[in-house]
A protein has these predicted regions:
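Non-catalytic terminal/accessory segments
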Residues: 1-596
Length: 596
């Protein structure tokens, strides 16, 4: 039988080659066991694999028999998703607002992952190129890269904000959108079951009437399918709005160039002081010319980028155009998508002022810097997009929230020790700071003011030294001296099987990403065929990897981290030796592991 992943790859190619194709009978691929082994491979390494939903179902205990039971329930259409367990997480550092997460059971995660793979094969090739959220080989950085390239020269920004986007997705609208592309009642009914599964909060069941639970495996692609309608609307609006530029010079520019040509003509016959005066006049006129707009702004253009529910438009036009576009957006979102565009947060900002997108401040530069080219000069930065770090709004709240710094009465900032991590080892303390520093610096590695993070590095480094000093009742200077490596940096030594290694304190310049602007294209089939069948092979072998018993049904024992195993039990030694988070064992061994 042909591997299902190859069939999905063929579906992907058909969708890419014929964007109007309607797909049918996709539900049957949910009944193929090989996709569930691939789904388990995709999920088991995640931190959430061991997180419980509303019951004790986790990645531990996965088996061929479990896959067979899931497939049978899907085949006879008795499969019913469990309600998700609702949990709240903080939205932002130092914010009192919280975001609800819905945590499914692991069995539901498996089915959702298989469903996600099927939907992705159909929709990924037809999603807008302006959409970057929750998509393979795309990220915040690819969205910002596209913005930097496409928004050059725009006059206005429209920052889009949909009120409670994920919580207000209309289930009927979503079902209608999917039904337009996929004519498969069983598949749409399964999606409907997940949408209507409800949630448990404080052991009370609550029905869901709208929205996709944040935390669900299939929720991101369902949100993208829904918001792809917004992408298509904006792109259609942009085509109608577009007006090509009448390429003619401004009267002011023509006047200056005419004066220069007249002076150059007079220069041919001039002598002495007259010639010197003309040369000075020409130089002054050229300086004026380089500061004068050369082309009339008669073009009309809309540029658009979306990352999940966060989107921004760049408009070449006037403010009245932006107001009209905003009204059109609001009408479409309310009438077609049944959601609401926030009037207060959907801002219209002139491009010489900063707008906010994906945690960056963006603006269009109006610098008149000149660059020599042979016998003439040209303007280089005018109209280019600048991405900046909002240091006061993003970095400082992060530092205060992590108790890295404090503000003195005179307003100055100083790094402080983080007493709540004194109990950690020196290696763990340095690793914590390194992880936080690299996370911030990697995200802002494409900012034009990236060097501002040198101050961030300084505050993090001296907070780390003060934390180590506080733990050992010493001083920062002594800790620096103790851990100095002789190469101008410092780090904590630690023992490994290969000998002593050193965890050096991270540097912000090491995070400057030089390869960011290259997109990697990965073939879908090549990325999944091969090692992805290892779980299938191990379970089908019917040989217990612990006791060696043969021809027995097996289950997967799962742990979150191999490094946390102590090596005191036989099964721990086996997992450490294999360097795996999973072990295929018989039911007797699995019972002994959990009940020694």
């Amino acid at each position: 039988m042909q591997p299902t992943i190859e069939i999905l790859d063929r579906i992907r190619k058909n969708s890419r080659d014929n964007k109007e194709e309607i797909f049918t009978r996709l539900y049957r691929y949910l009944l193929r066991p090989d996709l569930y082994y691939l789904a388990y491979k995709n999920l088991y390494a995640n931190k959430g694999a061991g997180t419980k939903g509303v019951n004790d179902d986790t990645a531990d205990g996965f088996s061929k028999e479990k896959v067979d039971r899931i497939i049978q329930s899907l085949a006879d259409r008795t499969y019913t998703p469990n309600p998700v367990r609702r949990k709240y997480i903080q939205k932002k550092q130092n914010s009192t607002k919280k975001r609800p997460l819905g945590i499914p059971t692991f069995t539901d995660k498996l089915v959702q992952e298989v469903l996600r793979m099927i939907l992705e094969s159909v929709y990924e090739p037809i999603f807008s190129n302006n959409s970057h959220g929750f998509r393979p080989n795309r990220s915040c950085h690819t969205a910002l890269k596209s913005l930097k390239r496409e928004f050059s020269g725009v006059s206005w920004f429209i920052e889009g904000d949909i009120k409670g986007c994920f919580d207000n997705i209309d289930h009927q609208v979503l079902a209608n959108v999917i039904n337009a592309k996929i004519k498969d009642a069983r598949l749409i009914q399964l999606i409907w079951k997940f949408l209507k599964a409800g949630y448990m909060e404080d052991w009370q069941y609550h029905a869901t009437y709208s929205g996709c639970p944040q935390g669900g495996i299939v929720s991101p692609i369902l949100a993208n399918i829904y918001l792809n309608e917004l992408d298509k609307f904006v792109e259609k609006t942009a085509k109608e709005f577009y007006k090509s530029r009448d390429r003619h010079h401004t009267p002011e520019y023509d006047k200056v160039t005419w004066q220069i040509k007249k002076a150059q003509k007079q220069l041919k016959t001039a002598t002495g002081q007259e010639k010197t005066a003309l040369l000075q006049k020409i130089a002054q006129l050229k300086a004026v010319m380089h500061k004068t707009p050369c082309m009339s702004k008669t073009d009309k253009v809309i540029k658009y980028i979306r990352y999940a529910d966060d989107f921004i438009l760049g408009v070449k036009g006037d403010k009245a155009d932006c107001e009209r576009i905003k009204r059109q957006l609001s009408d479409f979102i309310s009438q077609t998508l049944k959601m609401e565009l926030s009037e207060q947060k959907t801002l219209i900002t002139h491009s010489n002022q900063y707008a906010r997108f994906l945690g960056y401040d963006i603006r269009v530069r109006r610098d008149q810097k000149l660059k020599p080219h042979g016998n003439h000069v040209s303007r280089t930065l005018n109209g280019s997009v600048e991405l900046c770090i909002p240091f006061a709004d993003k970095i400082m709240p992060f530092l205060f929230g992590k108790s890295v710094i404090r503000q003195l009465r005179d307003g100055t900032i100083e790094p402080i020790a983080r007493k709540y991590i004194f109990r950690c080892t020196d290696l763990e303390i340095v690793s914590t700071y390194n992880s936080e520093l690299r996370g911030i610096c990697n995200y802002y590695s494409i900012a034009s003011n990236f060097n501002k993070l040198q101050y961030f590095e300084y505050l993090m480094e001296y907070s780390c030294l003060k934390t180590l000093a506080g733990k050992h009742e010493s001083t920062s200077r002594k800790m620096m001296r103790k851990y100095r490596d002789g190469n101008g940096s410092w780090g904590v030594p630690y023992q490994t099987k290969a000998g002593i290694k050193r965890r050096s304190f991270a540097r912000f310049m090491d995070c400057k990403n030089t390869d960011l602007w290259t997109d990697k294209i990965i073939d879908f089939a090549i990325a999944h065929i091969g090692s992805r069948t290892s779980f299938d092979d191990r379970l089908s072998a019917r040989v217990c990897e612990l006791c060696g018993k043969t021809n027995v049904p097996l289950e997967i024992h799962h742990v979150n981290k191999v490094k946390n195993l102590k090596g005191k039990q036989l099964w721990e030694l086996a997992m450490i030796a294999k360097k795996r988070k999973t072990l295929a064992v018989c039911k007797d061994c699995h019972h002994k592991i959990h009940h020694p």
